[in-house]
């Protein structure tokens, strides 16, 4: 944030965000603080996110099975190349629950994606995040942007949308893909894949049985 000349603006912005009590939209900020947003739009969003209390999307703790292993994994340092694919053909094993758990327990580190175009995903990537989760709806694995996954692990993302930019992630991130179908094993180098197959009969939520 600017150190000189903008202190009053930022103090007013802080008071406004706290009074609002929820994450402001870009439109909200533009209408209330147009000059501040024009100069520091990304800082406005990051500052508001840091000020507000994190939202608890779910309760419980992943204690057994693939969830416990994944929770332990994202709590530590990320592998420099590996991309994790959690494959659950049956469904309802707690993949979306785990995304909510990460957002609740690691709100400043986690970003969740669905299916999207390559340029849209690249534009949305927050370089401060260290846990990237892709929650893929059933039947849409063929639209997964493998090049984005690889760029995340390489920490280098070219974003051509709007104001083109070259993003460099702060650190090597964890990357997880949750899907009901098998990934394309020819889309990436062999050493990129770690495929975790959820046994049939596992039911979602915390405390899964292995």
Can you name each region flagged by the protein language model?
Residues 1-128, 133, 137, 196, ...:
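P-loop NTPase catalytic core of nucleic-acid-dependent motor ATPases
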């Amino acid at each position: 944030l600017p150190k000189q000349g903008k202190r009053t603006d930022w103090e007013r912005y802080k008071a406004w965000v706290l009074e609002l009590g929820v994450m402001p939209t870009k439109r909200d900020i533009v209408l209330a603080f147009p000059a501040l947003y024009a100069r520091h739009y990304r800082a406005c969003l990051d500052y508001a996110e840091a000020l507000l209390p994190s939202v608890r999307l779910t309760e419980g703790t992943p204690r057994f099975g693939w969830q416990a292993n994944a929770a332990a994994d994202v709590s530590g340092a990320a592998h420099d190349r590996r991309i994790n694919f959690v494959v659950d053909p049956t469904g309802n094993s707690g993949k979306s629950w785990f995304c909510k758990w990460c957002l609740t327990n690691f709100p400043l580190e986690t970003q969740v994606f669905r299916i999207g175009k390559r340029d849209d995903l690249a534009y949305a990537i927050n370089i401060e995040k260290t846990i990237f989760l892709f929650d893929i709806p059933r039947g849409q694995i063929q639209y997964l942007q493998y090049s984005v996954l690889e760029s995340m692990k390489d920490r280098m993302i070219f974003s051509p949308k709007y104001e083109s930019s070259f993003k460099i992630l702060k650190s090597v991130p964890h990357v997880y893909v949750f899907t009901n179908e098998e990934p394309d094993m020819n889309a990436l180098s062999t050493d990129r894949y770690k495929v975790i197959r959820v046994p049939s009969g596992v039911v979602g939520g915390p405390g899964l049985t292995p």
